[in-house]
Amino acid sequence: MGIDFVNKRALLILLFLSLSLQLFAHGDLSMRIAEKTVAISEDPNNAELYYERGLLYQEHIEYANALEDYHKSQALGNTDKAVYYSIAELHYLTEDYNEALKSIGTYLQVDSIDVRAKKLEAQILFQLQSYKKSLEAYRYVIHTMTDIRPEDILEYCDIILAENHKNHKAALEAIQAGLDQLGPHTLSLQLKKLDYLKESGQTEKALEQYNYFILQYNRKEFWYYKKAKFLAEINKPHEAFISLKLATVAIEQLKPKFKNMSPVVKLKEQINSLESSINNQKS
């Protein structure tokens, strides 16, 4: 009897896989979905099984099937807050932001201080262009999250500037707080700091930021050129010319194998082009 049951279970899994193999891109997920489907066929009133299969469908980007399983799980009595989060996340991924906001709102009624949920709420509000509310929610995330990442800081800055496109002061403060927390040489934050300094017209601080990159990184030739290009843009041709010469010197100091690499060859062309442009402006 036990062997017959095992054989029947294996047959059901193989049958499910053979019918749906073309629909599934990832073998491991396909197998796990198949196993959940067999388990549901054996225990059709198990709310947790439907929720678990819904998560697998969502991971497999089969959103309609995932949503159907989430609702079925709820209909069978699953009132856990995690279902509301998953539904909110799914609606967010499918760009149904109003429904996403309803679901995450229900979740937050149960657990108002959950950082992950507050972050999703902020992201949903951002897509709904409710920037002030989005900023409030994400501010809570930034001040509460213990495992903050550079991309969290950058997303927060995007919301700050969406709420007020001139508020580079707050964005730069957020970047600095991120650097203090994650380390002063966090590249993505330092790059964004340079962007914000340039966008806000803080030319001297932007030049200091270029100097930071020149001092910090071995391949100085690229940063000398970028600095020269910026100097030319702000009408400082003499300083730009000096920076181009320093870029050329840095290239000459490279080992032969690096000098002949296509990015360096292209950089030489860009240096020559910018030098010509500066000389033409002088004459």
Q: What residues fall within each predicted segment?
A:
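Canonical tetratricopeptide repeat
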Residues: 52, 86-89, 120, 155-156, ...
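Structural marker of alpha-solenoid helical repeat scaffolds
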Residues: 42, 76-77, 110, 144-145, ...
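N-terminal leader/linker segments that initiate helical-solenoid repeat arrays
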Residues: 23-71, 75, 262-282
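Terminal, low-structured helical/coil segments at or just beyond the last alpha-helical repeat
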Residues: 184, 208, 230, 241-283
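Register position in tetratricopeptide repeats
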Residues: 59, 93-94, 127-128, 161-164, ...
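Canonical positions in the second alpha-helix
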Residues: 39, 72-74, 106-107, 140-142, ...
